[in-house]
Amino acid sequence: MNVVKDLLKSGKTVIGTAGSAFGDMAMLADTGFDFLLFDTQHAPVETKQLIPALQSMRGKKAAPVVRVSSNRADLICFALDAGARGIIVPMVNTKEEAVAMVRACKYFPLGDRSNSGVRGDWGEYNPDMMRDGMTSEAYRSYLDMVNEELLIIPMIETQQAIDNIDDILSVPGIDVLLVGPSDLSIELGVPVDYPSDTYQRGLDTIAAACRNHGVVPGMYFIPPGMDPNFYVDKGFKFFTVPWARWAAEGVQNGLAGIKR
């Protein structure tokens, strides 16, 4: 149901790219990426603006993943209702914040997410479903499936989070611990100096803790000039890469082969 979770469970590297709120994402969602990431923290968009893009991805290969702007239950709930199959929350620094995130993502009894009917790729919303014969047991089965399939991704971006990493990773339900590369480098006193020993030691600490807890470490993006395989070799199996340059190269190669 959620291809990203299946890939992570099998130990594969999961690669995504940035999605846009202002366009039909159907084509990009079927190019081979495992997920499209929609940002509402730094991008000038609100979750409600993502609805057409998320709906255009229905039935496509890539899973829609949304980064909300903060660790608020209402923002998380609305992003999920809009069709997200994964949630990223920035600046998760403590176990308590991780617990709050997970509970906002999951339905009772694993969480506190409010229910508004069958949503997204898990089914069509139909307010008459109970009257028309959907049993209570079947509805419970749907809720349990969503709880199981949803991708939950807190971000680690501060020294405080590194200090609390074992407590954070002890929270059940976390699938990926996602490094915010630039913010973490600033916190470690080496702003955007990604090759520095200090920064790399921080990444090694994160990767080791994730291994110990059975959680996949990821990078929000691969820093400019760095080889993605460098991070894969460290154990980071979830990240985004830019697609525009690859698309431009493909167009250029295609045009170059035509007599003009």
Language model feature labels by segment:
Residues 53, 57, 95-111, 244-260:
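C-terminal helical cap(s) of enzyme catalytic domains, especially alpha/beta-barrels
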Residues 26-30, 66, 71-85, 89, ...:
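Catalytic cores of alpha/beta
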Residues 1-18, 132-148, 204-206, 211-212:
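N-terminal amphipathic alpha-helix/helix-capping segment at the start of soluble metabolic enzymes
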Residues 14-19, 36-38, 64-68, 87-89, ...:
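Hydrophobic faces of well-ordered beta-strands that scaffold small-molecule active sites
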Residues 47-81, 104-111, 145-147, 195-218:
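Alpha-helix-loop-beta-strand connector modules within alpha/beta enzyme cores
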Residues 172-192:
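Histidine/lysine/aspartate-rich catalytic loop segments that bind and position anionic ligands
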Residues 1-64, 70-71, 103, 152, ...:
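Conserved N-terminal beta1-alpha1 strand-loop-helix module at the mouth
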Residues 74, 86-172:
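Conserved anion-binding
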